[in-house]
Amino acid sequence: MTKICVKEIRKLDPEGEAPRFGAAYEAIELEVRPQDRPTNIEDILSCVRRKLHAIGPGDTLCGLTGTDLAQLEKTIRSTIAAQVNPDPSSFPEKLPHEEFVRWIARMPRAHPVEVFTTNYDILIETALEAERVAAFDGFVGCNRPFFSHDSLTRPESAPGTAWTRLWKIHGSINWRLDTVKGRQRVVRTDPHNEGEMILPSHYKYDESRKQPYSALLDRLTRVLERDDAILFVCGYSFSDDHINAIIFDALEAKRRPHVVALQYADPAEDSVLAERAARFLNLMALGPRAGHIGGRLGAWRLQEVRSAAQIEQAFQLDPAEEGEQPIGSGTLLLGDFARFAAFLGALTRPA
């Protein structure tokens, strides 16, 4: 994403002229460059927004005027939106989301299945419709559906347990801020590149405290307050403080809710996830090569090496030495959402 945004930023400079925007990007990148990792687009966008708030009339920062900085910020926003709003004709014939949705549809439940996502795209919505699974996202109305806070807080205002809940806690490419009779509200429209979204920047925590985002985060809090709550996490790296606070506070307040965090990469020893997984017995952090279970860290090893469709979807054995039998060590694949969805699909198919 960062490389794509940088490419679009450099296009702002007219050919044959001094590269003002390119030079400004390089100055900003140098200013915000972290010591322990490469600069990402969140670092850049945060800095651009700080400069937009600080610049005065007639001033320049990094060689850009206030108007230039606004154009730079808009370019980053629209580039991010375009990347999460691909042409549906470019979708693969089968999305992994369809296996995920199919599993949801076949799962018996006492409560509605509630899916929380930070993604802006509409891939899950596309899969829900392809599989004809009834879903509710907090929007009501027929012509121009609008976000209804009551539908999240009052059970009688929402559909029954057969309807899957989809909560997009960072917004969506098909949301828009609309003004009706002098009052602003968020409505659901066709996907577009100016969606109502919390973009990656240092302002995202403050933005999450506004409606409808605060209502959606409150919903996550209430779900985790249930004694029998189980939250499976896939594709989230525990880098958002506002979401982490809700999850970790719930685990600390009660011992019965459980969180299973499927990670694409093994959490670093000093990461917030590894630190909390060592403390909370009701938090499992499962990486490719090792997992925290019951507060203890250990490498993966199958107790019994055998072939089964479900195991093969979830775990890849390390190759054995020539002439030797596999010892059971290997890689857990479920931190990859496509693999996780395929695993769930294997559970729903006849043996």
Model-assigned labels for residue ranges:
Residues 106-109, 159-162, 250-256:
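Short, conserved loop/helix-junction motifs that constitute active-site signature segments
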Residues 205-218, 238-240:
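A general structural motif
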